[in-house]
């Protein structure tokens, strides 16, 4: 009977070689895995915009118009005020009933104004997953600051639901020619249920600020204050006009809990009325280059605060996603031609998309 062959052990050099090979394989595979995950997140983001587009078109089929931008940034959606001029909430609230979020839309329905103010606290703290880009943050409430709310009590800790998507406010500047056509906190609480009574609703000059003439002159997008836009008003064609797209957000604010006014327009609830938290613009071909630079779509980063309240952008590399007024979803390059992008924001400029 022969003696057994001695088992040969790994040498230290061989072990180090194996570890090095494994390290190289991980280094090669990890970027591919990360890229695949980001591609999946970006695709999910596109699906969210598809849902928003379809919900908006379903609302249009039901009511005859797109959702209005609401009354102002201190008002949230009211379940007893329909979806037209009488609705103080913004586009995000208007489409809830068509996004499998009917329960959130109906919070406080039929209650007295005082009881409803308490009930709507729940609405403000109820995120809709489709309003969040998974490349940026999960669907959860985050700090919004101690803001005044006209028709609702603030949630505990001032933690609101947010939105990563913004309606198309147009290719005009929010404030032009010195006219007061920018943002408003909206009318006083007395307006609820009494719109458009001048005695009840002209607080903060609301009715004088957002007249039909001023809307037609200064607001050429598809989501505007007070007045819902009809598809027939989109004279440039629904396939040539942005409905909603990803908004730029400084990455410092993804989950920051200590900011107040320094928020780059991410400090109000998703369902509030017209505000640059939920509206952005395409004025990238403005005559003044400094003004135009504010509106250039930009990838999220932790340094760009200039123009952060008015520009579109995303957490994706190279592109941001947008849904058009026909419900289609497109990925738009950050290198998009300035004139072309500006035209995509106007509902009736008559210009041909290059």
List PLM regions with ranges.
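N-terminal leader/signal peptides at the extreme start of proteins
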Residues: 1-12, 73-76
């Amino acid at each position: 009977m022969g003696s057994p062959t001695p088992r040969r052990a790994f040498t230290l050099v061989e072990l180090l070689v194996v570890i090095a090979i494994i390290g190289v394989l991980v280094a090669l595979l990890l970027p591919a895995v990360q890229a695949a995950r980001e591609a999946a997140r970006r695709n999910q983001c596109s699906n969210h915009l598809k849902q928003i587009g379809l919900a908006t078109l379903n609302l249009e089929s039901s009511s005859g118009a797109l959702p209005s931008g609401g009354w102002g940034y201190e008002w949230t959606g009211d379940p007893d005020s329909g979806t037209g001029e009488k609705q103080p909430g913004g586009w995000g609230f208007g489409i809830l009933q068509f996004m499998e979020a009917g329960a959130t839309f109906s919070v406080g329905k039929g209650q007295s104004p005082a009881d409803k103010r308490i009930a709507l606290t729940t609405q403000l703290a109820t995120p809709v997953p489709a309003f969040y880009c998974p490349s940026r943050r999960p669907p959860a409430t985050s700090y919004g600051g101690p803001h005044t709310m006209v028709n609702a009590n603030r949630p505990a800790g001032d933690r609101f639901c947010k939105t990563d998507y913004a309606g198309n406010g147009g290719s005009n500047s929010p404030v032009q020619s010195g006219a007061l056509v920018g943002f408003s906190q909206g009318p006083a609480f007395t307006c609820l249920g009494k719109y458009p009574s001048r005695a009840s609703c002209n607080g903060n000059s609301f009715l004088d600020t957002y007249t039909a003439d001023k809307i037609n002159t200064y607001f050429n997008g598809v989501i505007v204050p007070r007045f819902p836009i009809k598809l027939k008003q989109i004279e440039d064609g629904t396939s040539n006009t942005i409905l909603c797209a990803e908004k730029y957000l400084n990455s410092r604010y993804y989950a920051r809990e200590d900011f107040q006014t320094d928020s780059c327009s991410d400090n109000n609830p998703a369902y509030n009325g017209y505000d640059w938290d939920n509206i952005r613009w395409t004025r990238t071909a403005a005559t003044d280059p400094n003004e135009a630079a504010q509106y250039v779509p930009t990838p999220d980063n932790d340094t760009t605060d200039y123009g952060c309240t008015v520009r579109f952008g995303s957490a994706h590399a190279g592109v941001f996603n947008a849904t058009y007024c026909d419900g289609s979803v497109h990925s738009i390059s950050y290198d998009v031609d300035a004139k072309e992008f500006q035209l995509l924001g106007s509902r009736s400029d008559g210009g041909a998309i290059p």
